[in-house]
Every structure is written in structure tokens, then in C-alpha cells.
Amino acid sequence: MEYRLTTPCTVQDLAPLKAGDTVLLSGVVYTARDQAHKRMMEALDKGETLPFDLEGSAIYYVGPTPERPGEVIGSAGPTTSGRMDAMSPRLLDLGNKIMIGKGKRDDAVKAAVVRNGAVYLAALGGAGALMAKSVQTMEVIAWPDLGCEAVRRLTVKDMPLTVILDAHGGDLYQSGPAAYLESR
């Protein structure tokens, strides 16, 4: 199935999604990679507020390249999500609802997705220029010293994504190969 979603999202918005579904995501998406996640954990440990509201948020694991003249953003392909696994459950427990990246997630992340009615969506790896076409606006909102890993607020329209982990425990990286082998 194909779904159109607009952030921020609720448990009810995400409940119909199943692993393998296509999502066209619009609204605000925040960028945060390894170093930004570490800074968010440090801020939370100190009782500080984060640079954006986690409730219903979408976080894209991306470090975009510099934009060319006349462009909103440079290439914006996903980075490997596993590097955020140690920190993702905490953010999910605090209200983050959508994680966007590529690659498998660990069991703690999978459990946190189900526990919080969240989803993990995959962006097409190797297609950073395609992903960038969905971005309408971009603004650095925190930690500019991190360069490409600074936290950005993106406004996106119809960003093409695939549901990898759904709120019901579905995992496309398990069900996809199994369905293929069964069909042979």
C-alpha cells in the first residue's frame, strides 16, 4: 500500500502502516546523525531541552552535502542507521515517531518502535539527489560546528520512503527475504 503522511505524526497516523508499504512523507523532518545524537544524549543527561520537539517528530539520518547555487540542499542520501541504535530507544520513548535511514536496526530499537507505536522508514541509499528533490526548505537549527552533521529543519513534500519496521513488529528485512524464498 501507499500512504501519504504529514508530520508531526501520532500513533494513530502510523498504525495502518505495514513493513513493505510506501510512504510519501511531507512536513517537517529534522536531520541528525551520529554526533548530533551524542549531543542530544548529553543535553538530555543534563536536563536541557533539545533543539526541537520530539513529540511526533521525524528524524532523518543524513549529513547533506553543500547546496549548489539555486538549490535548497545538496545531495541528501541516508546514512547507516545502526550507528544511532544505542540512542534511538531513548528518543522514541520521549516521543520521536519516525526514524529515516538505511540498514538493519538492533532488537532494542525494534522493541522501542513497537512499544511507542513508531516506525522506521528507509530512504533509497545511493539516491541522494532524488531524496534532495523532496526538500523545499532547509535551516540549520543546532550545533552548526558539526558541519554536515548539524541539526537541520527540513520542510519536505512527498519524500519517497519504505516502511522497514512497523508498530506491530513487522520487519521488512526479515519478511522480504522470507517471502522471496517462499515464492521460489
Predicted regions and their residues:
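Active-site/ligand-binding-proximal alpha/beta "capping" segment
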Residues: 88, 164-184
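Feature captures the catalytic cores and cofactor-binding loops of soluble hydro-lyases/lyases
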Residues: 31-32, 36-159
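Short, structured beta-strand/loop micro-motifs enriched in basic residues and often containing a Trp
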Residues: 1-9
